[in-house]
Amino acid sequence: MAKQKVRIRLKAYDHKILDQSARQIVEAAERTGALVAGPVPLPTKIEKYSVIRSPFIDKDSQEQFEIRTHKRLIDVLDPSQQTINALMKLNLPAGVDIEIKL
């Protein structure tokens, strides 16, 4: 019989909050006896925007902005019901997007 795997993908704009959340998830899973692979840092998505500074003329003067989306991947191998309950009860900080696949 194949072992069950829970794949957790985390996304955030702030890498410090993201690493803190990943650490909380790994600690909760390890406390219940599940095997954990990760957190694996995935490539950071960088979106760049150029905006003209002047409201009327001077296209040569532009300002650049960027948004960095940091991502982490955590695999919980062979989780028990206790592991899933512990992960559901975690209170993670705002600003972290969590995607869970069974």
From Swiss-Prot:
Which Gene3D superfamilies does this one have? Ribosomal protein S10 domain
Return one Gene Ontology term, BP aspect. translation
The record's section on SUPFAM superfamilies has: Ribosomal protein S10
**Which keywords belong to this entry?**
Ribonucleoprotein, Ribosomal protein
Instruction: Spell out the Pfam families in the cross-references.
Output: Ribosomal_S10 (PF00338)
Molecular function terms in GO for this entry?
structural constituent of ribosome; tRNA binding
Does the keyword Ribonucleoprotein belong to this entry?
A: yes
Q: Which GO terms describe its cellular component?
A: ribonucleoprotein complex; ribosome
Q: Assembly state and interactors? A: Part of the 30S ribosomal subunit.
This chain's function reads:
Involved in the binding of tRNA to the ribosomes.
Query: Which family is this protein grouped under?
Result: Belongs to the universal ribosomal protein uS10 family.
Protein name (record) = Small ribosomal subunit protein uS10
Report the source organism.
Answer: Roseiflexus castenholzii (strain DSM 13941 / HLO8)
